[in-house]
Amino acid sequence: MEIIFIALVSYLLGSIPFGFLLTKLLLKQDIRNIGSGNIGATNVLRTGNKLIGFSTLFLDILKAVIPILFIKYNFQNLIFISALSVFLGHVFPIWLKFKGGKGVATYVGILFCINYILGFVFIISWFIIFLVSKYSSLSSLLASLAIPIY
């Protein structure tokens, strides 16, 4: 029962669509009709509002950090259940008919909670790749590959 509760709460926290909510409340626009149609921070930046873009990034990271750190210090053996559930909540949010973001910011929050070194490896790899390629999506994919290599 404990596993189901942790998975459900983590999923629900992960499914909070901050990019959608912030652009709807502050810009009166539906982020799903802008740029790539994705609700994540990269697409929110395409609205031209950097504050909302970086707020989305911060909140998408935070929505992973809060439940995972709680689980890490109270139910250590269930941390990966919480991490997977938060990630799935972001990618498949019940509130938006299971069409969410790509999960990159949420993944960063997960990495920092599980092992902060992995979080830094991802961030540094992402920045280096982005400086060369100028593509956020490519940077995210290749930086993710750096994690198992490390």
Region spans (language model):
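Hydrophobic alpha-helical transmembrane segments
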Residues: 4-9, 53-54, 79-84, 108, ...
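Helix-coil boundary and interhelical linker segments in multi-pass alpha-helical membrane proteins
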Residues: 1-6, 65-81, 112-119
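N-terminal signal-anchor transmembrane alpha helix
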Residues: 2-26
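Short, non-helical or kinked segments that cap or interrupt transmembrane helices
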Residues: 30-38, 96-106, 135-143
